[in-house]
Amino acid sequence: MSHYFKRSLLLALPIAFAFSSYSQTSIENVPKGWHLKDFTKDGYNGISLDKAYEFVKGKKSQTVIVAVIDSGIDTTHEDLKSVLWINKKESPGNGVDDDKNGYVDDIHGWNFIGGKDGRNVKEDSYEVARVYHKYKAKFKNIDPSTLSSEDKEIFKMWKRAEKEIVGNGQESGMQVLILRRTYDGAVKSDSILRVALAKETYSGTELEAFMPVTEEAKKAKSTFIYFFKANNSMEMTNKSFLDEFNQYLSGEEKKTQAAEKAPLNYRSDIVKDNYNDFNDRYYGNNDVMANTPFHGTHVSGIIGAVRKNGKGIDGIADNVRIMTIRAVPDGDEHDKDIALAIRYAVDNGAKIINMSFGKSFSPEKAWIDEAVKYADTKGVLLVHAAGNGAANLDSSENFPTAKFVGSKMKAPNWITVGASGDVKAGGIVASFSNFGKNEVDVFAPGVKIYSSIPGGNTYGNAQGTLSLIHI
């Protein structure tokens, strides 16, 4: 689930049932593909893609491999399967590491959050909870003056985690109560609508066209339309919405228990590496689709969906290959997986690495820093999303960052991107986007972006961390 979905859903919940109808806002007035348009010619604050192609007309292009470190990609999608990176040194399906890179049958990339037995990590805990409980016994009630210099730095991180965890108490409990009641109401409304529509699955668009007869069905329609539109996801189905809602609710319930209950180690049970040994790096599997490839599929379509084929959408780049690296679960990613994902991308020819994820703590950031430095020696650019917390990154964190641990130096091969919009799409700067005069380099379209989604030939809107793709 996208982090924007979570944020907008939470903001919508307290008033979701207070209105019997949804007031259409200007965000619905932008066309599909507005992010590619030109302000002077088309009236939208897009990236002026046609002008860019006109500028390079007649010039010879070179194929660029873009690594997408994300939740996975639907490798069967009609608009993506022909632009996927193929490891030509590997023979598919023979169970042999033909290219001797340590990863067996890595045809389109690698899944760092999978097990050799074929199982995959779908959900995971939040880093703040992992940090808090890892050091709780060591630092609780300790006199910090007795600590070594190294431990003092870890103590500072733990105190920040403690403040966030303990401070989540009563307020978070009330939010979860609202979430639970609203989810139960959504399930009830869905059961009413499925009977009224005489179908088990329906999209927001189908629901909007439906004219209910009974007052009960009218109220149920109003509720679901509100949620669909609040997330700019009219193409989403009722089943997908309730599944994502349930996942989010589960995560929020875990947060309220975080102070007393240590998070489950989902990754360890499946991946089975020695996490603390960075040299134990040849783990995972080649299932790059795995469980929930929504975000990665959407991102990849924006980058390189086949252009001018009359299907779905046109991607930005017309001579690109997408390398799929799955390292981001529903929850917070682990630093080791991200560091190894970056190294895998570099070693296998990627020239750009797309990273549409983030978290507020990064205890093993030094591993990522070394991977970023390695990428720099190979001329590889890393593009990272600023994040969707509406926070000032000059005074808060969204890891990974360009700043190296224990240094004032920044990675020269790193760009941090915030999400922009359009006046017709709610404003030039997306309301949810992080920002920062010093820490955010540029803004790019990130509101109501239409692209490929899992399902083979399916498309829909999403928004948030995917803004960096336009850079």
Model-inferred region functions:
Residues M1-S26:
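Bacterial Sec-dependent N-terminal signal peptides
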Residues N388-K408:
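Glycine-rich, charge-decorated loop segments at or immediately adjacent to ligand/cofactor-binding or catalytic sites
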